[in-house]
Structure formats: C-alpha cells, structure tokens
Design a protein with these regions (language model features):
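Mature extracytoplasmic domains of secretory-pathway proteins
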Residues: 61-100, 105-111
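Helix-rich interaction surfaces within compact, conserved domain-sized segments
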Residues: 93-144
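Bacterial signal peptide processing site
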Residues: 26-28
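Bacterial N-terminal signal peptides that target proteins for export
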Residues: 2-13
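Classic N-terminal secretory signal peptides
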Residues: 15-19
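C-terminal motif of bacterial Sec signal peptides marking the signal peptidase cleavage site
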Residues: 20-24
Length: 144
C-alpha cells in the first residue's frame, strides 16, 4: 500500500476515534455554571507543523495563516500555544513526533462559527499539504 494512503488511513482512523469519543459528551445545562460564568463553546484546534516527515511550516507562515484565516473569523480573540505532538503510525509501527500549534477559541454557540472551524481546518490542510487538523469542541463555563 502506498505510504500516502497509509498515512491518510491513520489520520482518518484517529479522527473517527476522536469523533466517537466526543459523541458521548453531554451539554451543560444552564444552571451548571456558577455566576458570573456562562456557557460558551470552547474549541481547541491542533495544527501539525511537519510537511511529510520533515519540519516545514515556519513561525511566520503560521502567523500569516492565523492573520488571514482565523482572526477574521474569530475577531473577539484566541490563544495560540506551542506544542509537541505525537501519534502512532500503525502501518509503519513507529511513533511520529512533530511540532504543533494549539489554537484555543471560545465563542457564543453559533452555527456559522462552528462552520468556520471546519473552514479553517480545510484551509490549513489545503495550504500546507496536511492530512488532518485535530479539532475538539465542547461546552465550558466561561467568565471574563
């Protein structure tokens, strides 16, 4: 099986696993938050920085991506954190490690904002030849 097919399969399997695990998450009832907190959507997006097996997405390229794709969709704010990620390539039976960027976004629940998360991930995959962007979405009690 060609390597790119194996990698795609591994990424799809990881995405499916996260989706199944997240499907059991319960929504918080409004009374679950203590004042002055309120329920908002909390999203974490994890962007790998390798292209293939090699480092390839620079700090400036990622900063430009945030400025063009994320900030216009979420102008109220976001947080970017550096990370080190790893995942198991079951086909090659090796651990793959890479630098990552974690983007945290909190927003009032809105169908368009949820669609924006998908658009951001799709844009990153297209622009940087990525197989996937891990996106985790849930409710959180938030106060500012």
């Amino acid at each position: 099986m060609p390597r790119h097919i194996r990698q795609l399969f591994s990424a799809c399997l990881a995405t499916l696993t996260v989706s199944v695990l997240m499907s059991g998450c319960a929504w918080l009832p409004p009374q679950a938050c203590l004042p002055p907190s309120r329920i908002m959507v909390s999203a974490e997006m994890i962007f790998g920085r390798n292209i293939g097996d090699r480092p390839g997405i620079s700090e400036s390229a990622f900063a430009n991506f945030v400025a063009r794709e994320i900030t216009p969709r979420f102008p109220d704010g976001l947080t970017v954190i550096d990370g080190d990620g790893q995942w198991r390539d079951g086909v090659r039976n090796v651990d793959v490690r890479e630098r990552a960027k974690v983007v945290l976004i909190t927003f009032a629940d809105d169908a368009q904002k949820r669609a924006d998360l998908v658009a951001i991930a799709d844009s990153y995959k297209r622009q940087f030849s990525q197989q996937s962007v891990l996106t985790k979405v849930g409710n959180a009690c938030v106060s500012f």
